[in-house]
Swiss-Prot record:
The keyword DNA-binding applies. This is Histone H2B. Residues 13-28 have a biased composition (Basic residues). The modification N6-acetyllysine is found at residues 6, 13, 16, 21. PANTHER family: HISTONE H2B. Disulfide bonds: none annotated. It comes from Crocodylus niloticus (Nile crocodile). The keyword Lipoprotein does not apply. Core component of nucleosome. Nucleosomes wrap and compact DNA into chromatin, limiting DNA accessibility to the cellular machineries which require DNA as a template. Histones thereby play a central role in transcription regulation, DNA repair, DNA replication and chromosomal stability. DNA accessibility is regulated via a complex set of post-translational modifications of histones, also called histone code, and nucleosome remodeling. Residues 1-12 have a biased composition (Low complexity). Monoubiquitination at the C-terminal Lys gives a specific tag for epigenetic transcriptional activation and is also prerequisite for histone H3 'Lys-4' and 'Lys-79' methylation. Phosphorylated on Ser-15 during apoptosis; which facilitates apoptotic chromatin condensation. The nucleosome is a histone octamer containing two molecules each of H2A, H2B, H3 and H4 assembled in one H3-H4 heterotetramer and two H2A-H2B heterodimers. The octamer wraps approximately 147 bp of DNA.
Amino acid sequence: MPEPAKSAPAPKKGSKKAVTKTQKKGDKKRXXXXXXXXXXXXXXXXXXXXXXXXXXXXXXXXMNSFVNDIFERIAGEASRLAHYNKRSTITSR
């Protein structure tokens, strides 16, 4: 039994790389990840702007809530405009 255990780690390393590549290609939840990243970007920007002041967790949660609310309002307005204009897609023109 020790022999298969020795040979198993080398293929696992290669297979892990292949698995992560396929997971990235098949990952369709990018929209949810983008919304969560907004809070991290806002916290990083606040830390860069005022290095002396530390951002509390409550402040980060409030900023995250604000950004998510704005995104939801923009998406709702875009949906309404698309419905009013009887268009299935929204363009920048």
